[in-house]
Amino acid sequence: MKITHHYKSLLSAIISVALFYSAAPHADILDGGEIQFNGFVTDDAPKWTWQISSPDQTWAVDTADARTENGQLVFDLSDKGPLPFLEGYLYEVAERGGPGFTPFITFSSNGRPFAVKEGSDTSVQRFRASVPVRDPETGNVSGQLSFTLNQGMAVSTGKQEEGASTPSGMSLVSGQSVTDVQSGSLPQGLKNRLSALLLMNKGFGNGMSAVDNGQVITQGVLADGRVMNLAAAYASAVSDFELRLPAEGTPARWQAGLNVTVTVQ
């Protein structure tokens, strides 16, 4: 996993998988699947730090484990996840809310938006999507990779002056970054990660707590200048992978790209 800084808020991950046929006659093993994550991130006025948190992966698939459907081999790769994806947190606890704390997150593959299969769009807390799988030798689309993405943003605040009232503990936020937020349906692993990321905000303390309070509040708290001692974090993970490749002429290698762009306002 590699992170490179540039002038715009851009972070990308490329999943590159090589599939090799065994030399044995009638062999069904596609061996040596390698997943590589590469990240690129920048921020004009950085208040957040961003990272793609999964190391490179190596997968192997066996056609004996696939089912055939409409001329395709369908591989259930749900045992390969969840994998942490985009994560972020404030460099330091903000004295007050205001501009520069609200990230807008968009996902794409090869310049095109994810094909959303479940959920209204890619801003919701949980959605299922697919991206094209290409043969790197020809550049042609040879299949698709489907997955579920869960995401959440959380805040915790410390002591407040009169005029501002915020819950104690870690609250999920709903708004421009993540919509359709329901605390009870966010995976516990992501909640635990959000708590850990909040603690990475430099200066976390002064009455703050990273313990989940089960509440959902408006993301407007990040832009509210009345709110003091503000910590924030974002986390996402991909899981429930399904790979579809042609049953005839299965490519020796395939590649799929997952890109995420972060614009902070």
UniProtKB/Swiss-Prot annotation:
InterPro entries: Fimbrial_K88_FaeH (IPR003467)
Gene Ontology BP, a term: cell adhesion
Membrane-spanning parts: none
Localization per Swiss-Prot or TrEMBL: Fimbrium
Keywords from the UniProt entry: Fimbrium, Plasmid, Signal
Signal sequence coordinates: 1-24
Keyword Protease: no
Domain of life: Bacteria
GO CC term (a single one): pilus
UniProt KW Signal keyword: yes
Primary site of residence: other
Pfam family, one: Fimbrial_K88
Protein family according to the UniProt entry: Belongs to the fimbrial K88 protein family.
Name of the protein described by the UniProt record: K88 minor fimbrial subunit FaeH
Organism of this sequence: Escherichia coli
Lineage of origin: Bacteria, Pseudomonadati, Pseudomonadota, Gammaproteobacteria, Enterobacterales
Gene: faeH
